[in-house]
Amino acid sequence: MRGGQRRASRLRPPTYRRRPPPAASILEVAPVQTQTLTQTDTAAGGAEPDAERGVLLAMPAQPGAGAALPHPGAPVDVPEHPEPPPPTRTESGGPSSDLFRQYLREIGRIPLLSAAEEVDLARRVEAGLFAEEKLRCSPGLDDRLALDLDRLVVLGRLAKRRLIEANLRLVVSVAKRYVGRGLTMLDLVQEGNLGLIRAVEKFDYARGYKFSTYATWWIRQAMSRALADQARTIRVPVHVVELINRVVRVQRRMLQERGCEPTPQEVAAHLDLAPERVGEVLRLAQEPVSLHAPVGEEDDVALGDLIEDGDAASPVESAAFLLLRQHLEAVLSTLGERERKVVQLRYGLADGRPRTLEEIGRLFGVTRERIRQIESKTLSKLRDHAYADQLRGYLD
């Protein structure tokens, strides 16, 4: 009998138990990638992660809310979105390049968003900003309404962070176009992330545009402003940098069309500017060069060694000054100690700084009139000296 039951059990098809479907929830937070990218902003939100989780569980379920954020195991409808580029040559080598590669790996793990998910997140961001403004401007709200607004603020911040993280690789893609203009890749990405945050706050989902199309403008604007403010050794105002870019673009276009370099007058006529203004802009467009920059292949000659010093005396002037000094010393050696000292102080022959009669009088303890008499007597004696004719030759 037992053998028959065993045979019957072998012939019976196996049965499987179905797992119960998961309960509906309003928001599923993206899986934690790294502590740097996905840690909760407790300082800005004013709530701990456990408190935010309690807020999410307390919210009633809404139709279609479960699709706001993709489940870790669910397939993601990947829209057209740039992939994180490989590190550039400027970022190769050194600890900063290792950090940048780690950053690329981290943002590459974050799942992208579909168009519907972007709209849903943007709607929550807008509701959170509205609730935050309402709480700030209306302090006399009842407790229940204030609690509901707090929930909207928390949900808005979570949606804002999710929308930012999903578009971090867009910033890296845009930053590739600005490499080599004065800022490193890390600095460009940092400035572009600030523009991305601004784009999330200003995005209007009701217009029907993709978020990446709208955010690209803000990212480029942030990078361009950073290049204008930080890229140059000598800072130039932003409006002057924009004018420089206009002049350079016109120069390049005219060079391609004509095959020769346009003159400042031609560029000024094309831009409806004064030729003097164009010349000044072209002068400001020049980049400074270090005087210690090596010249040649040997690297033993610096650029500063080849630049003429306009203030330096010529060899002829140096030789004439040396002869004049020798003749003056020969003439002054014929005077007394007091007379020689007065002439040297009066005309600055010792240190190059002439003294007044009062200053010399205080040094010798006599009046300025007495110093004037000594000076007059000494000059009369020098005029009749044998070297007087030689000294007059230096006056020509």
Curated annotation (Swiss-Prot):
Keywords: DNA-binding, Sigma factor, Transcription, Transcription regulation
InterPro entries (UniProt xref): RNA_pol_sigma-70_dom, RNA_pol_sigma70, RNA_pol_sigma70_r1_2, RNA_pol_sigma70_r2, RNA_pol_sigma70_r3, RNA_pol_sigma70_r4, RNA_pol_sigma_r2, RNA_pol_sigma_r3/r4-like
Gene designation per UniProt: hrdA
Protein name: RNA polymerase principal sigma factor HrdA
GO terms under biological process: DNA-templated transcription initiation
Region feature Disordered, mapped onto this chain: 1-96
DNA-binding region, residues: 357-376
Keyword Transcription: yes
GO molecular function: DNA binding; sigma factor activity
